[in-house]
Amino acid sequence: MAAASAVPVLNAAVDPVPGDVRIGVASYSFREFSRSLCIKGTKALNTPYLCIKEFHALYRSTPQELDKAKADFQKAGLTLTGGGTVYMLKDDMADIKTYFEYAKRLGMPMMNIGATAKSLPMIEKTLKDYDIQIAVHNHGPEDKHFPAPSDALKLMKDMDPRMGVCIDVGHTTRTGKNVLEEIQAAGPRLLDMHIKDLSDLMNRDSQVDVGDGQMPVVAIFKQLKKMNYKGIVHLEYEINADNPLPGMQKSFAYMRGVNAALRA
């Protein structure tokens, strides 16, 4: 990755100021690159928090290969905050367990998942054997199961508290829902967040660097602080796939600026 190799890699990530919203990377942003370059790019962004997509640790890996992946992240000083989106769409307990075993082997505390109304109870049951949080990731109008976070939340009201949502703010706004209201409604079931910015909040193809679009990032961070949100806001940078780092650096700089402004 040319951009990553051109940026000095710091030896230690920036320690967040207490009270700041913690920001990290969704490795889908580095989907065109190897695990080693994903690690290098994440370190260049000066954050320890990484939520990995399968590109960087394959589901079909052997236990030894997953151990190697885990060691690679640990040696780099990165914290695996979760993985996904992991699709658990089958009404099949054995299939669901394969993903929990994958997450357990990598030491993931959480999985962001795609699910169905039928598979959710099976996932909840399996969770109790693994103590891994489950965050349903919404995917907007094209998602026939859970377009908005509230679509998943209404099925979770009596479920284990380790069942929650990963709110993708871009997909949420495209449903026409108020993203701030969706965040507030999630409350303690908000386990994770994927952030992006759009120049047109209804158009998935209008993604821009965070801070350059219409996403109410400042208001989102204010709401997260008000809720005492303990999770991570992961940048999911879906544009400029062949050279994502410059735009990711700009996005991180903007979000760090928002954090700084909200400390007063």
Feature-to-residue mapping (PLM):
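Histidine-acidic metal/acid-base catalytic patches
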Residues: 1-8, 13-22, 32-45, 146-149, ...
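Conserved beta-strand positions
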Residues: 25-27, 52, 113, 136, ...
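Glycine-rich, positively charged N-terminal anion/phosphate-binding segment
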Residues: 60-72
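Residues that line or immediately flank small-molecule/substrate-binding pockets and catalytic motifs
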Residues: 54, 85-87, 115, 190, ...
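Active-site acidic/histidine proton-transfer and metal-coordination neighborhood
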Residues: 15-17, 37-39, 49, 56, ...
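Vicinal oxygen chelate
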Residues: 55-56, 60, 204-208
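Extracytoplasmic "Venus flytrap"
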Residues: 25-34, 53-59
